[in-house]
């Protein structure tokens, strides 16, 4: 039951971060492309790579893994919003933007998970 509290606390932080980052990206770039979702997915993927690698090279407590990996990063990143935004772009006739959104989200996020892991592995 203790881990549930860590997930909830991490989730509340991740959700607020996602909201604030999305607002900032909307102010900076406008609403023509879903940069907020892209940024939180890239950031969350990088941090997931770091957390995964830290778990490989050191002892991370189950509470830390629950707090950061499941709670904070689970709430920060968003596959459902990404999917909905991609579909909306297609429905609006913005096929190039929709494809770009899918390719960049998936490709960059996989790459930054790798970068996060390599950052940790190069230090240990």
From Swiss-Prot:
What's the main place this protein lives?
membrane
One GO term under biological process is:
cellular detoxification of fluoride
Q: Does this UniProt record's set of keywords contain Ion transport?
A: yes
Q: Which domain of life is it from?
A: Bacteria
Report residues binding Na(+). Answer: 74, 77
Which keywords appear in this protein's UniProt record, sorted alphabetically?
Cell inner membrane, Cell membrane, Ion channel, Ion transport, Membrane, Metal-binding, Sodium, Transmembrane, Transmembrane helix, Transport
Checking InterPro entries in the record gives: FluC
Answer whether the UniProt record assigns the keyword Cell wall biogenesis/degradation to this protein.
no
User: One GO molecular-function annotation for this sequence?
Assistant: fluoride channel activity
Q: How is its activity regulated?
A: Na(+) is not transported, but it plays an essential structural role and its presence is essential for fluoride channel function.
Q: Where are the transmembrane segments?
A: 4-24, 35-55, 62-82, 95-115
**Cellular component terms (Gene Ontology):** plasma membrane
**What is the annotated localization of this protein?**
Cell inner membrane
Task: Write down the NCBIfam families for this protein, in alphabetical order.
Answer: crcB
Report the function annotation for this chain: Fluoride-specific ion channel. Important for reducing fluoride concentration in the cell, thus reducing its toxicity.
Q: Which family does it belong to?
A: Belongs to the fluoride channel Fluc/FEX (TC 1.A.43) family.
Q: What is this protein called?
A: Fluoride-specific ion channel FluC
Instruction: Tell me the classification of the organism that encodes this protein.
Output: Bacteria, Pseudomonadati, Pseudomonadota, Gammaproteobacteria, Alteromonadales
